[in-house]
Amino acid sequence: MSKLISYAAKSPLRNIRLGATQIICQHASTDCMHMAASASASSSARKTYSTLAVDLTKQQMLLRKPLETLALQITKRSMFIQTQDTPNPDSLKFLPGVEVLGKGNTYDFPSATAAHCSPLAKLLFRVEGVRAVFFGSDFITISKEENGEWGLIKPEVFAVIMDFFASGLPILHEARPNADTEILEDDDETVMMIKELLDTRIRPTVQEDGGDIVFISYEKGVVKLKMQGSCSSCPSSIVTLKNGVQNMLQFYIPEVESVEQVFDEVDKVANSEFERFEKSLKQKDSANPPVSIGGTQN
């Protein structure tokens, strides 16, 4: 037995076994190191992916605002605004391609002081040379000052309209479009017929020219109307009123004897100032007549 033990101690098989055990232990240690390294790498990868996800989220947040700005710019660029001439050379009709006040609705802004109820009208009056603004169902009429140039006014009006419709703000605040032709309970039969004829036959035609006609009153055969938009200062407005509107009303409603144009206070002041300006120019010319020298005038 002791020999067997002694032999086993001396036997190379033990060394082999011991060597195998050492090798196994070494391999096991190596595997543990690999596993530890793998776990460390996995943890590092998770941290890297987590950091990357956070970075991507931050980048998305940072990019969101420029993308919204880009979308806004695309919206603005996608709007195609057309212009249309009117019988009045000082008025131009702008067609943004979207609804403005809706079918049959209009609103007149004869001056900047009347634009308190409309953010869009306020912005348009800031354009140099704009004298009056008028909103229709799907159009905007701009009336310029007499010495204004469309070449300078049009680009600014285009920019204002595009920016405003892209903003999504309401066109009117606490204001109703014209409802002058709305049938009221106390309207007599003649007034009802006048309003209906204005609303169905006359106003649509006038609105195509960038203006409108507002019913004021009817009394003793006289219909009083107010011209708006491009029609308010149009040189041919009187001809339109007499030859067009009056003739049509008299044809369908025999009770109508004549049609008269009504001017509000703003129109009266503007006309008064214009007449005074013309008078001062004439007086200046008469006070300083041209001097003739050698058959020529200076």
Curated annotation (Swiss-Prot):
Subcellular location: Mitochondrion
GO CC terms: mitochondrion
Transmembrane spans: none
Region (NifU), start-end ranges: 194-262
Highest taxon of source: Eukaryota
InterPro entries assigned: FSCA_dom_sf, Nfu/NifU_N, Nfu/NifU_N_sf, NIF_FeS_clus_asmbl_NifU_C
GO annotation, biological process: iron-sulfur cluster assembly
Ligand binding ([4Fe-4S] cluster): C231, C234
GO MF annotations in UniProt: iron ion binding; iron-sulfur cluster binding
Keyword terms of this UniProt record: Iron, Iron-sulfur, Metal-binding, Mitochondrion, Transit peptide
Family of this protein: Belongs to the NifU family.
Name of this protein: NFU1 iron-sulfur cluster scaffold homolog, mitochondrial
Organism: Drosophila grimshawi (Hawaiian fruit fly)
